[in-house]
Amino acid sequence: MVPVEDLVYRYALLNAVKHRGRANPGAVMGAVMSNEPELRKMAPQVKEAVEAAVERVNSLSPEEQQQEMERLGLEITERKQKKRKGLRELAGVKGEVVLRFAPNPSGPLHIGHARAAILNHEYARKYDGRLILRIEDTDPRRVDPEAYDMIPADLEWLGVEWDETVIQSDRMETYYEYTEKLIERGGAYVCTCRPEEFRELKNRGEACHCRSLGFRENLQRWREMFEMKEGSAVVRVKTDLNHPNPAIRDWVSMRIVEAEHPRTGTRYRVYPMMNFSVAVDDHLLGVTHVLRGKDHLANREKQEYLYRHLGWEPPEFIHYGRLKMDDVALSTSGAREGILRGEYSGWDDPRLGTLRAIARRGIRPEAIRKLMVEIGVKIADSTMSWKKIYGLNRSILEEEARRYFFAADPVKLEVVGLPGPVRVERPLHPDHPEIGNRVLELRGEVYLPGDDLGEGPLRLIDAVNVIYSGGELRYHSEGIEEARELGASMIHWVPAESALEAEVIMPDASRVRGVIEADASELEVDDVVQLERFGFARLDSAGPGMVFYYAHK
């Protein structure tokens, strides 16, 4: 096996050669996590190796990077215009395709974000294009400082690779520059009207007195805004005052916010609204296609006014329907409040719809990706169910998850009359005998799952037949034929002498306590196993006292 450092170095080298000699740590980490699933459990170590590899590769000249490529036998595979099943073609492709995933850093990503992230990534791969991660943090009151690290980490888990990271709070001077250009072109004005007064005029389709002021006076007002109080002035983009949608009439592009920003402190007081910063960035960053929900249709109209004022060609806009999902908390603000109240244990509480909560339960990113590609970019609304996610995830886990006996709410019993010890070997995976076997030794006392324990004949799977009656477990016979004649119910079991304590955290955060067979001690954190006749679960803590998070049946 190639050492992690060497493997990561190759990914960094490929990324650098593909992108003008500069490797991006986020893109390299995403590529490693996506293509080398066995390394996911080593994410912290891999991240350190990635950072070191990127620094090493970026210190090389383009010629030296090419020499390294030849030495290692690496090649850039051309994938231009390669069709990928499940996604329709993009309209208006004229050259390099550039897309962006642009979350607000109010918290970690949830499964709703996964759709936009995956679709943009899939299209970037489909057309051998570029994907920009743009952190839209121009509302200082809605920024969670931890989100700057959580968002890239969530994308890495999802297997999304990006080529460039842009943080909008680093671009404030750019927004100021284009605000001035817009005012000079007569496309915007500074409005000092009281909000309720302007609303009445807007609803009647009438202009306020600020709209008719010349650009010189508006430029003076603009410069004075930096000393004004919050709420005393805004910049408005001129649109059609008779537009059928009042929300589009002379929309606000800049406003005063007297709040400290987690990254820039009190350096700035005038911040762009989303529609302004998004349109400016999409143009300046060369974004060719914008994928987003149909709830942004009105925003598209707003931004098109800005494009016309500045003489810019708008990107191709592709809108898709809403994604509905029942029985999951997707509200970031609601989740934060619940965490602060102690209702949730954190962003990875199993009741939440965050990607880190889903990952903690053992749901694989490949299952989420497959679902999002299946849903695609259709304009009709879609309903996403846990049942569908579980089905896709099960098809992945069935092939790789090791099997173990787990007795939930266990009852400890002695097998009365057992003639002698019974040694049982069962495969760790029924379809992959090469993985090896696990060994259970029945010596007398066993744990049986409380919910499955009923009076009558039972067969301890692969071991012996017993009769359970009046709280006593009595040996009957050993063969499977006798079990069939008895009509015995199959029941899994854990030898009492070697049992390990374990508990499973369920999706509703309830806890199921039990015991697991001794061979499970070989498991490592992040391993996903099948607890036979109970369900798939991910090992979250190795002990003492193993803790699993339940995925699904």
From Swiss-Prot:
Family: Belongs to the class-I aminoacyl-tRNA synthetase family. Glutamate--tRNA ligase type 2 subfamily.
Catalysis: reaction(s): tRNA(Glu) + L-glutamate + ATP = L-glutamyl-tRNA(Glu) + AMP + diphosphate
Annotated motif 'HIGH' region, positions: 103-113
GO molecular function: ATP binding; glutamate-tRNA ligase activity
GO CC term, one of those recorded: cytosol
Keyword rRNA processing among record annotations: no
SUPFAM superfamilies, alphabetized: Nucleotidylyl transferase, Ribosomal protein L25-like
Chain's role: Catalyzes the attachment of glutamate to tRNA(Glu) in a two-step reaction: glutamate is first activated by ATP to form Glu-AMP and then transferred to the acceptor end of tRNA(Glu).
The protein's name in its UniProt record: Glutamate--tRNA ligase
InterPro entries: aa-tRNA-synth_I_CS, Gln/Glu-tRNA_Ligase, Glu-tRNA-synth_arc/euk, Glu/Gln-tRNA-synth, Glu/Gln-tRNA-synth_Ib_cat-dom, Glu/Gln-tRNA-synth_Ib_codon-bd, Rbsml_bL25/Gln-tRNA_synth_N, Ribosomal_bL25/Gln-tRNA_synth
Recorded name of the encoding gene: gltX
UniProt keyword terms in alphabetical order: Aminoacyl-tRNA synthetase, ATP-binding, Cytoplasm, Ligase, Nucleotide-binding, Protein biosynthesis
Enzyme Commission number(s): 6.1.1.17
A Pfam family annotated for this UniProt entry: tRNA-synt_1c
PROSITE patterns recorded: AA_TRNA_LIGASE_I
Compartments, record wording: Cytoplasm
Keyword Aminoacyl-tRNA synthetase appears in the UniProt entry: yes
BP terms from Gene Ontology: amide biosynthetic process; glutamyl-tRNA aminoacylation
